[in-house]
């Protein structure tokens, strides 16, 4: 049996593997745009575990499975307790026998790590308090589709504005792995921390990428992509609106002046959902430089590719499999024959 592949963090994948995954995703997207839905996931079943509610992640996974011939099962918050009444080991063992692949959106990163460790089928991290790796893939697809004329990916500069959310760290991981320049422009106390920097240092040593963490707004100049997220962490006590505005507004709000400072050709990105009037203005979000809705569509694009990539036949074929299959088929047909 070949070893299964999990998708828990892009740190486990090489630049070449990630680019191959994106290329696969974009090729499937082109097929579907032209009316052909390749049945690449026919008879495959995805179990989706959600400890947090979701819009884009849930819809993208369900649609991806349906479009490619498979089926997705939604296990809502409260319907399944990872490590609660039933142990993670038991849950993963049972679901490994019922499904072909699992996706889990969890509160604690260790939960999805443990799920993957115990499952005999591939496991995808749909988001945790550590990272958001499926968002990374969608972002990479989007940046490749919107590359500035005459530039390669590694020539591009990406600036993240605001709070050091999971999305901020995930964007830092994928861009530096691609050899790009990443800047986190955010207030002190809400910047990428020493743990994040240690991981980015190791990636940059191998990739040639570079990163900067600063509260100096001059760092946004020359950006090819300007990215922001909401001004509060998902898994800590949320700041009140008044506290958020005192810390981040107006310096870290992406408005037309900030976009102009970044550069005339800079594109705007946001993982969504957005809090209009806080981290982003309507003028920018709905403006000609915004690609955030292309980015949202590419969640589906990249998830289709990811599912196909992970569900390659990792179970090595036994030479007797075909014989057993034919025998089982014959026995079933005999049983179903009318008397």
From Swiss-Prot:
Pathway(s) it belongs to: Amine and polyamine biosynthesis; putrescine biosynthesis via agmatine pathway; putrescine from N-carbamoylputrescine (transferase route): step 1/1
Keywords on record: Cytoplasm, Polyamine biosynthesis, Transferase
Residues where putrescine binds: 270-273
Residues the record marks as site: Important for structural integrity: 29, 145
Annotated carbamoyl phosphate binding sites: 54-58, 105, 132
Location(s) in or outside the cell: Cytoplasm
Reactions catalysed, as given in the entry: carbamoyl phosphate + putrescine = N-carbamoylputrescine + phosphate + H(+)
Gene Ontology terms describing biological process: arginine biosynthetic process via ornithine; citrulline biosynthetic process; putrescine biosynthetic process from arginine via N-carbamoylputrescine
InterPro entries reported in the protein's UniProt record: Asp/Orn_carbamoyltranf_P-bd (IPR006132), Asp/Orn_carbamoylTrfase (IPR006130), Asp/Orn_carbamoylTrfase_sf (IPR036901), Asp_carbamoyltransf_Asp/Orn-bd (IPR006131), Orn/put_carbamltrans (IPR002292), PtcA (IPR024903)
Keyword Transferase (UniProt): yes
GO molecular function: amino acid binding; ornithine carbamoyltransferase activity; putrescine carbamoyltransferase activity
Top-level class of the enzyme under EC nomenclature: transferase
Signal peptide segment: none
This enzyme's EC code(s): 2.1.3.6
One annotated Gene Ontology cellular component of this protein: cytoplasm
Induction: Up-regulated by agmatine. Expressed under the control of carbohydrate catabolite repression.
Function: Catalyzes the phosphorolysis of N-carbamoylputrescine to form carbamoyl phosphate and putrescine. Is involved in the degradation pathway of the polyamine agmatine.
Similarity annotation: Belongs to the aspartate/ornithine carbamoyltransferase superfamily. PTCase family.
Assembly mode: Homotrimer.
Name this protein carries in UniProt: Putrescine carbamoyltransferase
